[in-house]
Swiss-Prot record:
Domain G-patch: 11-57
Protein name: G patch domain-containing protein 4
Biased composition (Basic residues): 244-253, 312-324
Organism in which the protein naturally occurs: Xenopus laevis (African clawed frog)
Cellular component annotations (GO), alphabetically ordered: nucleolus
Region entry Disordered, spans: 1-30, 123-324
Species lineage: Eukaryota, Metazoa, Chordata, Craniata, Vertebrata
Length: 324
């Protein structure tokens, strides 16, 4: 990203304006020869408590548990005598065992109070300077000695080396007895085989059917049912379509019957979901219609009966009017 694309603060803008007045341009360095810095110094907020030169990746590279084990093991000597086994501590190593990475600078004898380096000693005649090694020798020797002090580096092995040392055994204890823990993988393979046996054939049939449809799209006089019958694929399209049509007819009949009943009563009923009684009545009416279609003679008699029934309530109304 260029410096222009980054949002600049008000202080940065003010400083650039002042520099432009004196002939400065973006991309040029400071100074008479223009060989200075080209970008302004930006403040970085320090959010941790680490000091200068701290390596945050040291916790991943330094195996402190390995170092502590090897350090304690090297400070102990085990000897077998006639009386038995004796364990003694080595007197030469007085340094404490810690989980921090050992460094040569911390163990330097010239360090005073753990923070200052001794440079000279005061005598009556003057100062006696301390001889210091050259910078090149000290840098090379310090790096090598730091690696020697790190006892965990001696046991850094790759996975292949560890497998060879362990004789091909893995971490779990069952591998020592020849158990490879492959039961889960075998179960997964069996599940995949069963799945392919069930659904793989159907997918193949569907693919063949789609290919057949694509081939026969341009042919005249070919229906989908004919294609399915030629291939021998079991389909229920015709059966499902006929059932769907029957259901539509039944719904239309029920709606027409409801409208007729509402017109006879003189008011329109609100559209509500049919109850159980309404469903039963509709079924009875359908059965009656079927009987009428089967026996045409009964159809002629029914209107007379219905007319008689329609006349009876009129007579009752007349009687009521007379009584009034």
């Amino acid at each position: 990203m260029s410096a222009s694309s980054v949002k600049k603060s008000q202080g940065m803008k003010f400083a650039e304006e002042q520099m432009h007045k004196h002939g400065w341009k973006e991309g040029k360095g400071l100074g008479r020869r223009e060989n200075g810095i080209c970008e302004a110094i930006k403040v970085k907020v320090k959010c941790d408590h680490a000091g200068v030169g701290h390596n945050s990746a040291e916790q991943f590279t330094f195996h402190w548990w390995d170092h502590v084990f090897n350090k304690t093991a090297s400070s102990i000597s085990v000897e077998a005598d006639q009386d038995g086994v004796t364990v003694n501590r080595v007197k030469d190593e007085d340094a404490p065992v810690t989980n921090k990475k050992p460094r040569k600078a911390l163990s330097n004898k010239n360090m005073l109070y753990g923070r200052f380096v001794k440079s000279a000693t005061l005598l009556s005649g003057g100062e006696q300077p301390v001889k210091e090694p050259s910078s090149s020798e000290s840098s090379d020797s310090s790096g090598d000695e730091d690696e020697k002090l790190d006892l965990s580096s001696a046991t850094k092995l790759t996975d292949e080396d560890l497998k060879k040392v362990c004789g091909g055994r893995t971490a779990h204890k069952g591998a020592r007895h020849g158990l490879t823990m492959s039961a889960k993988l075998s179960r997964l393979e069996e599940q995949e085989r069963e799945f392919l046996a069930k659904y793989g054939k159907k997918e193949q049939k569907n693919k063949e059917r789609d290919e057949k449809l694509e081939r026969t799209q341009g042919l005249p006089g070919m229906n989908i049912q004919q294609i399915y019958s030629e291939e021998g694929i079991e389909t229920n399209i015709s059966h499902e379509s006929s059932q769907h049509k029957k259901k539509k007819k039944k719904r239309k009949r029920a709606d027409s019957e409801r409208k007729e009943e509402s017109q006879e009563n003189g008011h329109e009923e609100e559209q509500m979901p049919p109850s159980e009684q309404e469903v039963k009545s509709s079924k009875k009416k359908k059965s009656k219609k079927k009987q009428r279609e089967e026996s045409p003679s009964t159809q002629e008699e029914q209107p007379t009966e219905s007319s008689d029934f329609s006349m009876k309530p009129k007579k009752k109304k007349k009687k009521k009017n007379k009584s009034e």
